[in-house]
Design a protein with these regions (language model features):
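Two-component/phosphorelay signaling modules centered on CheY-like receiver
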Residues: 12-32
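Conserved sequence signature across two-component system core domains
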Residues: 8-9, 34, 52
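Helix N-cap/capping motif at the beta->alpha junctions
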Residues: 33-42, 63
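Receiver (REC) domain active-site loop signature in two-component systems and cognate sites
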Residues: 58
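Active-site residues of response regulator receiver
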Residues: 55
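Short amphipathic alpha-helix used as the core "switch/output" element in two-component signaling
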Residues: 42, 64-75
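Alpha4 helix (beta4-alpha4-beta5 surface) of REC/receiver domains from two-component response regulators
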Residues: 65, 86-102, 113
Length: 127
């Protein structure tokens, strides 16, 4: 079943890298992009997003705060924090929020593993 994936990153280059990998891995799924947390929250609240990939370092609301806000309304949505900042504290906070963590630079294998797990999780929720 095709899903809609939201990529939230203030860096156009980072969004392009993720989009390129995404199209190689899941060409049948839909990818939508957001440049900041406020825009992402609007998109998520519309209910049209199944999965989210969220950058940690963004102006205003950071990625972990965005995950926390999404969790309040959509506790089962598969979410991953995508960041070059691989400090244990950040990875730990992501896990506390029941979010995955994908290090940058992004690899196809890491993205594929997360998306496969997300698809299984959504399938379980639907049944």
């Amino acid at each position: 079943m095709p899903h809609k994936v939201l990529v939230v990153d203030d860096s156009k280059l980072a969004r392009m890298v993720i989009a390129s990998a995404f199209r190689r891995i899941r060409p049948e799924w839909t990818l939508v992009e957001s440049v900041n947390a406020d825009e992402a929250l609007t998109m998520v609240s519309g209910g049209a997003v199944d999965i989210a990939l969220i950058d940690f370092n963004m102006p205003g609301i950071d990625g972990l705060e965005l995950v926390a806000r999404i969790r309040k309304t959509y506790p089962a949505m598969p979410v991953a924090v995508v960041s070059a900042n691989i400090q244990d504290e950040i990875i730990g906070r992501a896990r506390e929020l029941n979010a995955g963590f994908i290090p940058k630079p992004l690899t196809d294998d890491a993205l594929a593993a997360f998306l496969s797990g997300a698809a299984l999780r959504l399938k379980k929720v639907a049944t």
